[in-house]
């Protein structure tokens, strides 16, 4: 018996406990089976699949337009970033370019998504190690951002706002003004959170030198996003492979040097400031003369005609009906498109057979690679550190289980 458990001492055996699926620090439906030697973690076995809904298979039975809402339900704390990857993949296959105003709105809302995700993560990471105030402050700001989502798309979470070829509808000027007015006070909230956590003795004791990942290990495990930047690589798809109009934006990529939980926290804090900076640049460009114009391609075979036009023109009505019943055909081929989602590199590998439905849509979720490494990162740490490490990985189960 003792040999099977890998322990040497006769009569002694490791203690196995379940962490989750209803553990308050488990971030959704995570189940970890922990093997403990006293209080030291010997092995971590993550059990996934408790939120599996067969998303990739369902997408194969839907038209390209009907597939978009499935992406909101993957990483549901930053929904539009996922829609973005799918739309980019379909646009590559179709060979269409999004108008400039549509690109600016997409970038603006992707940065709102990044702040939504990082606010949730930083404040719940603080909650996991015992700080109760940050979530109250962070969620107040998230509430305002959810309102911006709602005013653009009609929904607070599952927006389904992006379309292949652009976005669903233009933003009213008042909404753009309100987002602009939100940016500067938000920086003060980040400063307040910073003052509360960054130099806090208890917060540092719980995070410094916990969950250290070297850069070589980060690449070997397939990490991306904050997880590799925390280990010292200035790798960000917005700079490395700029998509939409990120090449025009002026922003910095924060990187860590220790690769521990504390560095990852600091990077997320700085990324929120950089996102607010990008948002302000987007708003300035949306207000400029060259930022005016359509928000989506004006090809009625791909994007529906305007309501007013449908009331006048029979052709427009036919286009609309065909688009929402049959959809459009995408040229045969395969393509990989990736965006820098808040959690890391979110990729979509899309295979088209020339019909109106995707032949295959493989989703590359960043959280999946990070969760795989839980065993490797947690070994040798104490039981109490497991929730701190889990918090700094930023895992959402919608995208892990798909």
Curated annotation (Swiss-Prot):
Enzymatic reactions: a quinone + NADH + 5 H(+)(in) = a quinol + NAD(+) + 4 H(+)(out)
Domain of life: Bacteria
Record localization: Cell inner membrane
GO molecular function annotation: NAD binding; NADH:ubiquinone reductase (non-electrogenic) activity; quinone binding
Membrane topology: Peripheral membrane protein
InterPro entries, per database record: NADH_Q_OxRdtase_suD, NADH_UbQ_OxRdtase_49kDa_CS, NDH1_su_D/H, NiFe-Hase_large
Gene Ontology cellular-component terms listed: plasma membrane
Primary location class: membrane
Keywords assigned: Cell inner membrane, Cell membrane, Membrane, NAD, Quinone, Translocase, Transport, Ubiquinone
Top EC category: translocase
Keyword Ion transport: no
Enzyme Commission (EC) number: 7.1.1.-
Subunit structure and binding partners: NDH-1 is composed of 14 different subunits. Subunits NuoB, C, D, E, F, and G constitute the peripheral sector of the complex.
Role this protein plays: NDH-1 shuttles electrons from NADH, via FMN and iron-sulfur (Fe-S) centers, to quinones in the respiratory chain. The immediate electron acceptor for the enzyme in this species is believed to be ubiquinone. Couples the redox reaction to proton translocation (for every two electrons transferred, four hydrogen ions are translocated across the cytoplasmic membrane), and thus conserves the redox energy in a proton gradient.
Alphabetized NCBIfam families for the sequence: NuoD (TIGR01962), PRK06075.1 (NF004739)
Sequence similarity: Belongs to the complex I 49 kDa subunit family.
Name listed for the protein in its UniProt record: NADH-quinone oxidoreductase subunit D 2
Organism in which the protein naturally occurs: Nitrobacter hamburgensis (strain DSM 10229 / NCIMB 13809 / X14)
């Amino acid at each position: 018996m003792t040999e099977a458990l890998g322990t040497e001492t006769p009569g002694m055996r490791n203690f196995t406990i379940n962490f989750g699926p209803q553990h308050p620090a488990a971030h959704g439906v995570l189940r970890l089976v922990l093997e403990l030697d006293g209080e030291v973690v010997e092995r971590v076995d993550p059990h996934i699949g408790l939120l599996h809904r067969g998303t990739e298979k369902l997408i194969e039975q839907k038209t390209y337009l009907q597939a978009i809402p499935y992406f909101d339900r993957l990483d549901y704390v930053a929904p539009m970033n996922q829609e973005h990857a799918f739309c980019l993949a379909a646009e590559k296959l179709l060979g269409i370019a999004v108008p400039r105003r549509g690109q600016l709105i997409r970038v603006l809302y992707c940065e709102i998504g990044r702040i939504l995700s990082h606010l949730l993560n930083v404040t719940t990471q603080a909650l996991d190690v015992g700080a109760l105030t940050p979530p109250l402050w962070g969620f107040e700001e998230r509430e305002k951002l959810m309102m911006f989502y709602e005013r653009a798309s009609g929904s607070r979470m599952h927006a389904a706002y992006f379309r292949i070829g652009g976005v669903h509808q233009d933003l009213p000027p008042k909404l753009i003004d309100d987002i602009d007015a939100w940016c500067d006070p938000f920086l003060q909230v980040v400063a307040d959170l910073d003052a509360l956590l960054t130099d806090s003795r208890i917060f540092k004791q719980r995070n410094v030198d916990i969950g250290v990942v070297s850069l070589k290990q980060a690449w070997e495990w397939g990490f991306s996003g904050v997880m590799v930047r925390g280990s010292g690589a200035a790798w960000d798809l917005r700079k490395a492979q700029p998509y939409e109009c990120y090449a025009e934006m002026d922003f910095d990529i924060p990187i860590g040097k220790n690769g521990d939980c504390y560095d990852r926290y600091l990077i997320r804090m700085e990324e929120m400031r950089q996102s607010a900076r990008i948002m302000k640049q987007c708003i300035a460009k949306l207000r400029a003369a060259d930022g005016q114009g359509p928000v989506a391609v004006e090809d009625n075979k791909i994007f529906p005609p305007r309501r007013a036009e449908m009331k006048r023109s029979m052709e427009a009505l036919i286009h609309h009906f065909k688009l929402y019943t049959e959809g459009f055909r995408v040229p045969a081929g395969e393509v990989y498109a990736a965006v820098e989602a808040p959690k890391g590199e979110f990729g979509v590998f899309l295979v088209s057979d020339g019909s109106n439905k995707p032949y295959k849509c493989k989703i590359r979720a960043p959280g999946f690679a990070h969760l795989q490494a839980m065993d490797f990162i947690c070994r040798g740490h104490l039981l109490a550190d497991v929730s701190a490490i889990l918090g700094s990985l930023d895992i959402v189960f919608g995208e892990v289980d798909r």
